[in-house]
Amino acid sequence: MKEEIPLDKLIDLIINDYDRERIETGIKRQIMVQENKEPDYLPLFLHGKIPEMDRFPSYDRRDQFYDPEKMLYTLLWGCLSIIRGKADNIPCVRVNFGTGFLATVFGLEQQIFPDKMPWLKSHLEIEKIMKMQIEDLEPLEDKGLIPQWKRYTDFYREKLKDIPFIKMYLPDTQGVFDLAHLVAGD
């Protein structure tokens, strides 16, 4: 029997505490700062502990890595904390496969831990990298963790369709130099 994950109960808590005006004000303040304009005050980013969490299950990072429902559920606790904090944060979630996410496109695998973020098991030799062709990475949507990312993203979209104030953002793709370091090592 599949374990019941109380995702819908958590979504109900979020919807009940949502303050549209509060979120819109936070977004406006952040936009003003990004556009080098002066807001009424600098955005404040606050959140705190959620008392209800003690009555709900929790899932470690390994559980989340292999289950989109557990990952989204865990991330939504942060969104509830932001909403209750009534600061200028924007509640948001992402598929969180760790910094090695894009490196898996090159055929690298990550070690998955219960208590910390995933980490690459190995690197590619420079000689192999130098011989790679674009065709080696195609079709990109079938490589590495990209199919899982798409599946998790589709799941998130479906579950969040009635709460558009929770934004989705990109997984940790790293910059080009960090990605090169992850793939090639030192």
Feature annotation, model-predicted:
Residues M1-D186:
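Catalytic cores of TIM-barrel enzymes
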